[in-house]
């Protein structure tokens, strides 16, 4: 069979960890509460707990001058670090009270949650917690596409995208979490290789997908061969493996992808975009950013980023 010679989807099982909570990194902005909303809805539907995590950068992290050159004395540095710590704990207490009020009003589902405040660089603290506890998912809020470059949590989100070992849910400011958890119209970017099987198994095992409309999308490279045959093969695999969803295919030209993709998402009223993402070193991230990274800065749509671990 010609198509089987092009690509084979064997449906082999992927390894997974037993996960018991949803991790929500926050910076106390307005969209932190939106992220908490989405996280609590997801946790409720999947019988999980929520961990709300904030990290603050003390003076020991913020000093960037060469050794021997100090702006503050040790006493002042400790005072400033203590002040930042106190502010972080007070802000977390305010957020915790607001969440409890939302639960009491019935706005947030009543799920068990904890709050954690840690000293350190945000993306490092998130990675350390995630690697230690292996949450089911990381949920992060962010600004709209025109403001992400100006925003701390936006840049942190971009860093976590490229380093996370567990799925991420990214909720832009202005998105209604009720349209994301659960969701009906989904677009999934496909690499058209075996990693797609891994992506789909993880996604369909962790998200409500019954009666979903799924668009399988791919960027057609100039030197890429058998693209139509490969996406047809994967669409048939999906229809057989997930008969409770409907699937359609869409190919994009690499030169016009971002603009055309944005139009396509609006046309299909897509509420959630699923993107596989392979871990990259800093050189690759700077000079050859991933599709997930590009789309993150270009769209205002909720995203699920799923790490893939198969070799290139």
Regions found by a protein language model. Name each.
Residues 10-78, 184-250, 270, 298, ...:
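Small/aliphatic-rich secondary-structure junction motif
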Residues 73-90:
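A short acidic, glycine-rich active-site loop
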Residues 5-17, 60, 86, 97-138, ...:
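Structural beta-alpha unit
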Residues 177, 222-226, 281-282:
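Short, small-residue-enriched loops and turns at beta-alpha junctions
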Residues 139-142, 170, 215-218, 274-277:
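Short beta-strands and strand-loop turn motifs
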Residues 153-156, 230-234, 287-292:
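Charged helix-capping and loop-helix junction motifs
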